[in-house]
Amino acid sequence: MKLKVFNVREEEATLAQDWANRNHVELSMSEGPLTLETVNEVEGFDGIANAQIGPLDDAIYPLLKEMGIKQIAQRSAGVDMYNLELAKQHGIIISNVPSYSPESIAEFTVTIALNLIRKVELIRANVREQNFSWTLPIRGRVLGNMTVAIIGTGRIGLATAKIFKGFGCRVIGYDIYHNPMADGILEYVNSVEEAVEKADLVSLHMPPTAENTHLFNLDMFKQFKKGAILMNMARGALVETKDLLEALDQGLLEGAGIDTYEFEGPYIPKNCQGQDISDKDFLRLINHPKVIYTPHAAYYTDEAVKNLVEGALNACVEVVETGTTTTRVN
């Protein structure tokens, strides 16, 4: 069996080769993305493992079909970069890695939340200026006294809820599907609006859909509890960034922890030091004094990277051997 792997980082290459040696599979790895210019590299292979960031060109699907490719295994949980229906029309199975390390994202969410609540960024900035005074702007709150709303109570949302619960928080949640594992961990409310009205901290853990794109806009932020904090470790399109910045400037929100930005594709994960960034909203976001921005790094742990690499490659093998996979999304 021969598999083609795109968008491979050095750390992934080592893990992928270890997997290949154990499973007696031939791998060809490329640092570059799957594009119209590179799609011919797939000729003669049985499957593709990919880490697509921006939208995959629609013209690629029929070309893959012509070459006999029947699947793309995405090395992430999110698959919004693929045209799932078009892929299906061309007989291409798209799979993901739905549960590579919920704890990684959950722990990171709570870490950033604590940094915001205890004003760590401001304290560190003061210390760099040799300002060691105790003043009102650096006074924090006790996390355990806060009500936390989890929007999206799947694997990651529930893992996050458990940690907040461990701090003593009251945890409420909203999801169109109630998770039976959430009993005793959080209380479900009837709407997103009800959740944000009650919460001191709102944490997003939902996949992007046409219905929830820019759900968190200025109208929604006006319904937030005064002084609340927003955490988005899910997908950038859930939040209308211009409105978030306005809500922060107006004092509707006290702060925001943002790990995903809707138009991050040109920048993440790249080293852009010394380069001009043309996206003014992105610049405002990453430099806003009330925002802790991180570059889609919430998942980034040893465990998660290993599980993503091996999960995608296992899905490739499963499709080749059985015609489908348990992690199929289309």
Swiss-Prot record:
GO molecular function: D-lactate dehydrogenase activity; NAD binding
Catalyzed chemical reaction(s): (R)-lactate + NAD(+) = pyruvate + NADH + H(+)
Pfam families, A to Z: 2-Hacid_dh, 2-Hacid_dh_C
UniProt-annotated catalytic positions: R235, E264, H296
EC number: 1.1.1.28
Domain of life: Bacteria
Main EC class the enzyme belongs to: oxidoreductase
InterPro entries assigned to the protein according to its UniProt record, in alphabetical order: D-isomer_2_OHA_DH_cat_dom, D-isomer_DH_CS, D-isomer_DH_CS1, D-isomer_DH_NAD-bd, NAD(P)-bd_dom_sf
This protein's record includes keyword Secreted: no
Keyword annotations from UniProtKB, A to Z: NAD, Oxidoreductase
Binding sites annotated in the UniProt record for NAD(+): R155, I156, D175, M206, P207, N212, M233, A234, R235, D259
Family according to the record: Belongs to the D-isomer specific 2-hydroxyacid dehydrogenase family.
Protein name per its UniProtKB record: D-lactate dehydrogenase
Organism: Streptococcus agalactiae serotype III (strain NEM316)
